[in-house]
């Protein structure tokens, strides 16, 4: 899918890799970068920062609210025209609590934003894409959606759900012989602030620019799935062939992944939102 002359909508686009991908899309000739975010100040700052690259429109949208999403979609189309590329990038992790300490509100908020929100956004736009037989949906999930990890059980569940949904819709479109494409992206921890305090002794925490560049390239090439780094493509293979105790020993003790969240602090804004929801 080409970015040139495309209207590109990115949820969570006011910061992190969402904002970086928006800039990259404009650099590649996108007609308009449409930001959906809940942070008005962040939206305005991103518009000022990226305005020199091209047209940027921003809307305050709670993507976990289906009615709000539908109204915001209608407004975006009125202002910018049909959406060609949507990147579901909004996400949250509330804490590093073990599951027995997680509140029902934390569970609900995590599942709503990480799993249901990309479904809501895509459901609003997909019928029009199918009618035009044109468009691309990219869902940013997580390597945590393929690899179980202590102290992030609900986050992992939300991303497992997102991966299963995203890839299932991809196959539905394939069976329809549609030209609308789906890309599922599963990156490792990214150094954007969302995973402050994470420790990863073997696999380095990923740089946002690197991840954004890989995602943009995956969309351009209509890739079905992209693990970042590439080695994460093989996680499921090793899970199937290795005994569980060997798999746990390697990823938990050798790679240190099962202890990555032990000192997690996260982004203060996410913690505040979680406490307000509790």
Residue ranges and their predicted role:
Residues 2-34:
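Canonical Rossmann dinucleotide-binding motif of NAD(H)/NADP(H)-dependent dehydrogenases/reductases
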Residues 40-41, 60-71, 104:
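The beta1-alpha1 cofactor-binding region of Rossmann-like NAD(H)/NADP(H)-dependent oxidoreductases
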Residues 122, 158:
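Active-site helix of classical SDR
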Residues 30-45:
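Conserved glycine-rich Rossmann-like NAD(P)H-binding loop of the short-chain dehydrogenase/reductase
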Residues 142:
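Residue(s) in the substrate-gating loop at a strand-loop-helix junction
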Residues 184, 200-236:
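C-terminal helical subdomain
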Residues 97-99, 103-109:
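Substrate-binding pocket helix/loop in short-chain dehydrogenase/reductase
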């Amino acid at each position: 899918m080409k970015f040139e002359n495309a209207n590109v909508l990115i949820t969570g686009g006011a910061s992190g890799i969402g904002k970086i991908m928006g800039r990259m899309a404009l650099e590649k000739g996108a007609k308009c970068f449409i930001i959906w975010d809940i942070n008005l100040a962040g939206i305005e700052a991103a518009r000022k920062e990226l305005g020199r690259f091209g047209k940027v429109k921003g809307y305050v949208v709670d993507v976990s609210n289906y009615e709000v999403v539908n109204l915001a979609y209608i407004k975006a189309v009125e202002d910018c025209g049909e959406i060609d590329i949507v990147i579901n990038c909004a996400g949250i992790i509330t804490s590093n609590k073990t599951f027995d300490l997680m509140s029902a509100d934390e569970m609900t908020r995590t599942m709503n934003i990480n799993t249901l929100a990309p479904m809501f956004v895509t459901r609003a736009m997909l019928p029009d894409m199918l009618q035009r037989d044109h468009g691309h949906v990219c869902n940013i999930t997580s390597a945590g959606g393929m690899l179980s990890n202590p102290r992030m059980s609900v986050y992992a569940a939300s991303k497992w759900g997102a991966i299963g949904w995203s890839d299932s819709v991809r196959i539905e479109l394939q069976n329809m012989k549609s030209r609308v494409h789906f890309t599922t992206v599963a990156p490792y921890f990214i150094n954007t602030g969302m995973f402050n305090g994470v420790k990863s002794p073997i696999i380095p925490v990923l740089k946002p620019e690197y991840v954004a560049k890989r995602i943009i390239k995956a969309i351009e090439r209509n890739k079905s799935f992209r693990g970042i780094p590439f080695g994460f493509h093989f996680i499921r293979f090793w899970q199937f062939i290795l005994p569980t105790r060997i798999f746990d020993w390697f990823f938990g003790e050798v790679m240190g992944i099962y202890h990555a969240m032990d000192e997690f602090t996260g982004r203060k804004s996410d913690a505040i939102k979680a406490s307000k929801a509790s």
